């Protein structure tokens, strides 16, 4: 049915207000998407948390990036990617983990290939159970068994430490928990155990470990094959730990690099477009952060309790607890 903007907006407003009056503010929900522009993400998040007064706004980006977010927070204290696209142009080794970059991130893949054309010695490794299009241009493909990334990178961590490749000055100055990581990955000290767990041949495993140990400028890009997993957070941390141990981070051409599954999953996190966040990576359950954001917004409300996350949100819809939902830029069906 054709309608006007005014009629559509008025109808939505009336329906939302009716639900709020009858069932409370948490009867309303928004399900948004990593395909929204950052500005749109910001406005809808402000509207829901500051003007509707609920935190029931979540995104399909949670399904692809929540494990990376948790890994970043556990490693760095905040959700931050310590690199930029320009770093790929300065790297001497690029490790692609759980990513068919050629198909899923073609623009970045072409950028990596262009960098390799200017620097033919750039060593590209693909870690993926399948032989994909990305593997065709790689120098080394590691066909890992599904779900064994933690064993692989814990094995790399132990190899780097046991063979004197730790940057002890960096570790002492900027990290904590080294002994705990060494203790928790003790099994992976045995490279035969890593071979068995990962399904990767000893020759390929040694080539990978030795090449990474000898290369200063290393970027490890990890994506959906890492994140969309029951062990996603641990996988992310096992990758990041190797960079922290060797100091291959915070330098031109060297960093762990989590790649989103959708074009603006990171933008959504920047503006707080999740049920448990406020804008600018502020914490929704922190009273000081609540005050800062509400004052900046000049809004009548500010959500103070985490809303329903993606899966729980749709369970609440099924249970009849959510009376109205606005779905933006995605098709969850």
Question: What is the predicted function of each stretch?
Answer:
Residues 1-264, 271, 284-333:
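Cofactor-pocket helix-loop regions in the catalytic cores of large enzyme subunits
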Residues 276:
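Expand to "…catalyze enediolate/carbanion chemistry for C-C bond making/breaking, isomerization
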């Amino acid at each position: 049915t054709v309608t006007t903007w005014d009629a559509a907006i008025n109808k939505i407003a009336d329906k939302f207000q009716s639900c709020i009056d009858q069932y409370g503010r948490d009867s309303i929900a928004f399900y948004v998407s990593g395909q929204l522009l950052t500005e749109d993400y910001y406005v809808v998040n402000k509207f829901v948390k500051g003007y509707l007064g609920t935190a029931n706004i979540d995104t399909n980006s949670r399904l692809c990036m929540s494990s990376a977010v948790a890994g970043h927070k556990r490693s760095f204290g905040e959700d931050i990617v310590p690199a930029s696209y320009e770093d790929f142009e300065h790297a001497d080794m690029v490790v692609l983990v759980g990513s068919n970059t050629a198909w899923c991130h073609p623009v970045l893949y072409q950028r990596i290939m262009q960098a390799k054309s200017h620097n033919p010695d750039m060593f590209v490794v693909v870690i993926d159970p399948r032989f994909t299009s990305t593997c065709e241009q790689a120098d080394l493909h590691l066909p890992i068994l599904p779900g064994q990334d933690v064993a692989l990178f814990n094995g790399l961590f132990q190899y780097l430490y046991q063979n004197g490749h730790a940057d002890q000055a960096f570790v002492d100055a900027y990290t904590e928990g080294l002994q705990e990581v060494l203790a928790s990955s003790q099994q992976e000290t045995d490279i035969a155990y890593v071979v068995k767990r990962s399904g990767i041949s000893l020759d390929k495993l040694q080539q990978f470990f030795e090449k990474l140990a000898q290369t200063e400028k290393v970027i490890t890009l990890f994506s959906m094959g890492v994140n969309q997993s029951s062990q996603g957070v641990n996988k992310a941390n096992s990758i990041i730990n190797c960079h922290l141990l060797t100091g291959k981070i915070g330098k031109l051409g060297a960093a762990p690099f989590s790649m989103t599954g959708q074009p603006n999953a990171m933008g959504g996190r920047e503006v707080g477009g999740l049920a448990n966040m406020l804008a600018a990576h502020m914490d929704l359950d922190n009273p000081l952060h609540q005050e800062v954001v509400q004052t900046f917004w000049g809004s009548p409300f500010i959500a103070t309790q985490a809303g329903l996350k993606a899966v729980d949100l749709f369970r609440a819809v099924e249970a009849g607890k959510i009376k109205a939902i606005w779905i933006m830029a995605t098709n969850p069906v």
